[in-house]
Amino acid sequence: MDYYQSELIKLFQKSNEIYKDNNFETKLNEKNYKFLLVYLNSIHSILKIDMKLNIYQYINIEFKELILISKELMKIVFDIIHSGTWNNIDILFKDLFAYSSILYIYSFFLIQFKNIKVDNNNNNNININIPNPIKKIILKKLDLALIFGDKLFNQVINQIINLISNNNNNNNNNFLNNFKNENYNNNNENEIILNKEKLIKRISRPPSLNEFKNEYMIKGNPCVIENLMKEWPCFNERNWSDLNYLKNVAGSRLVPIEIGPNYLHEKMKQKLINFNKFIDEYIISKNSDDDNDDIGYLAQTKLFEQIPQLRNDILIPEYCKIKIGCGDDDNDNNKEDNVEINAWLGPKGTVTPLHYDPKHNFLCQIVGRKYIKLFSPKESNNLYPHLNSKLFFNTSMVDVENPDHSKFPLFKNCDYIELILNAGEILYIPPTYWHFVKSLSQSFSIFP
């Protein structure tokens, strides 16, 4: 047995241990989903896996039947997790989708091993040569598992991806030579004249944790923090302003994007797309004269759980770990691993409608510039939220750029503050503070 097979089997064994340790069978029985156990038991029976035994001895079993069963299981669980509102779907089924994807990939791999070569180079490193058609199928299935699954199997899935991508080092230079040096085109940015009496407070010297907590978080005062991000790798040796770098790291991966003027628009839709294709079609080729109905952007996605290499390019501001509330221990801040990080990447002209979020927000601008207009929670009654909507109750009905004052008369006298957020700056937005955002250029931001 070669190195590649043995490493894959170890990861598969690890996923089975996770399955057992988290009592999937008991939970499925309790939720009256016993029919799913029929599929799972059939899969384990084909593999003849007893969790107490070593699965190495079963390497030569015929796995075609396993592929059919695991594929059917994936389809059934996929339908379950898309049968209702995403946030209300039981995490158990999201985890089960990820596990069934691992089962499918494992059986698929073992059938395809005859097409996979493993070479040792002079440095005793392992080069795994997987034909591109096979690699595309594998990466697509694993990306779907990361996108639609929960976090339980993420580490195993990313380790499998790293294993099959282990031969990238020798191919990176050839890959980069296949396209011209491409970067964001931000030469034609919109110029916005700000009201000097409505400017947000800017902090050039990052405050201490206690100072920031007491003066901004507890009091609910938004601000812009400057000079805090300049040491991040994404501004230096792994620069995100270089699209070649982003393509090299994530080019072959499948990512979810949104297409349309904004999330309230009737033509709004979602799409899964190859990252390279997204960059070429929606970032590089996009200009301000294009139809906004076809504008595409990557928004509020768990990109860094899916592609940990990009996660290593950023740092989490210590302010994000401050706890606010009764009984909180100032010395017991949240661990960095528990901080949820969303990514936003899109072209010039994209708009996020006026809305509020229930938690503390830190908008970290990495590439490009954004115009942002903020309204205090005290103005909520004058901002006309969608009160009758379960999805958009936190979003205003007012078009901030072209308000209809006859329909929304109270909006005209609302107090506000505004700013242009530049690359390298962090905007702190307190909970329930209303904010409208528009990209003045092609833009990459994160929200820890």
UniProtKB/Swiss-Prot annotation:
A Pfam family of this chain: Cupin_8
UniProt cross-references to InterPro entries, sorted A to Z: Cupin_8, JmjC_dom
Gene Ontology molecular function terms on file: 2-oxoglutarate-dependent dioxygenase activity
Annotated ranges, domain JmjC: 305-448
Protein known as: JmjC domain-containing protein D
Taxonomic source organism: Dictyostelium discoideum (Social amoeba)
